[in-house]
Amino acid sequence: MSDDSWAPVLNGIPAPGNTFVLPEHKILYVSVTKVACTSLRWMVADISGEDLESFYTGLAAHQTRLMTIHRHRTHWEKTPQLFQIPKSLRGPISRDNGWLIFAVVRDPWSRLWSGWQSKFLVRHPFYVKRYGEEDWFPRVPESQQDVVEDFARFVFAEPWVTNEHLFEDVHFKTQTYSVRPQGINYTKIYDLANLDELFADIHAHLKGLGKDQELYLPRANETPLPLIPAVLEGGVGEAIQKSFQEDLDNFGGDWSLDKVRTKGASWSGDAIKHLQYHTVANERIGDISLVARQAAAQLRKSQELVAELTGEVEVLRARERARIVPRVRDKMLRIVKR
């Protein structure tokens, strides 16, 4: 039963798919890619009571076990998406009814840098296959300058706007697209720089329900190279700001190019070598994933064939029984009449 005075969870928009609903814990998390979403999904899965180890069996080209949390949502058994909850039952899902409805955002400069590294620079197999021939696809770097130049080329090409496939990729869409700040009535939208505030609020929320617990927060999907000032020089930072101005308008009260957090002034030679290792490892992961998926597809076909043949055998058996039983019955009747 809902109270008409409660703010509805949605403001006239379709229920989005990037949502994780925990009815017993009165939590609704709206996930945003490249904003601690791997760690936050593990946290949500643990609170919800999902079988965490079951995620490891996915066959996609995930770089680590922790990345398997991104396998298809059909694998989640206890954490529905908002659209899976009938409209008639969504009334109680409201910040005014004690629900914690939240999303997390980050400045667009570090987010794009993170997305470019994890998908392109380390050569994620899917992205190599789909975009490897594009002019803006980065080379395997030999130096810091290679990385800086290739990121600049990517930014100025703006393929998340011009490429029809990347245009649909949520890793490179605005955060506004995922968060829908005007369409969802949030308890709060948190900044990645202030995650401790989110965790404190989650603990307080769970404690109020008598369900407080330790939060499972594995650190995952770290980018091999931290953001350094050189990455945003030469007009790159300004170009990113222009492209993602919508996010700055909606969330960026404390964001500005001169406040972007960087770490160090340069990368060591070892850091570049470590990055090179990532590209080689991802290539091999892609090989193994492809073989595994092909084997799984062949197994499904074999199982379908077995089921089909089993059905045909049963039909033949039924026909044979229908043919033989009357004969046997007639023969027995003749014997009885003698």
Question: Could you tell me what each predicted segment is?
Answer:
Residues 1-315:
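Membrane-interface amphipathic segments in extracytoplasmic regions
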Residues 301-338:
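Helical coiled-coil/dimerization "stalks"
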